[in-house]
Amino acid sequence: MRHTKHKALQEVLTLDPRKDYERIVYLLACYEFPFDVARSGEMALFRTFAVPGIANLLHHTGEFTHRTQKRYDDTDLILSTIFENGFDTKAGRTAFSRMNKMHGHYIIPNHEMLYVLSTFIYVPIRWMERFGWRPLTEQEKLGLFYYMREAGRRMNIKELPNDYHEFEQFSLDYERDNFAYSGAAHKIADLNIDMFLGWFLPKFLRPLGRPFIYALLDEPMLKSFGFPRPPKIIVDLVTVALKLRAKLVSFLPERKKPLLRSKGSKRSYPLGHKLDEVGTKLS
């Protein structure tokens, strides 16, 4: 199979996640799991909407309700730029500056920032445990933890856990204590699902596609968004399709060139973008 003589994986196994986390995440996002990193990142962001405080702020800004596609593209561009270029490059520093400026325009509790950060560690890891073409190594799991911890420090997030399992437990406890239905969450989640389906389906067919998106959401998310539980057959179909994809990918030749999402075309920027202009326009 593909991973038995895989150069990127062999390199990962030589790296120290405490200091080589940027290289580990670059290999994950651009070589090993570009599809899975993108999809699980979407699910991580989606998961944060289940916290009423986060959903209410996003609804208040109007970014996810009036400019859903642009807000998605902006998030994708900023995160992809950091993944692909590194923290201390000009592009990486500009991306952090844009992100911090946008966040700094609002009063966001530290515990919400901590939780959002945690989702970008543990949601991708759980996704790849289920749907990845190979298991993640311990170096990759810890590398993602240390990477996001350093990202959190650069975002001025306080009380960052030092331990992988401690942060995971914080994330699980936070969801248990804070996930709840809110009208804002329902609205934002609904618009995002419509956006996802709009990439593939004409408007009149989108209601038929909704159960397939619901199939990717767990029970706490469905309840928080006020969405119905999808039929088991659809959940099974989605699961089988993603696992079949993973099996097929495992037999493909290894990627020779990195897949750079920040260089791809974006619906909101058909003529291209300037990184220092990406994001919300703040007064």
Residue ranges, per PLM feature:
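Mature, function-bearing regions of proteins
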Residues: 1-283
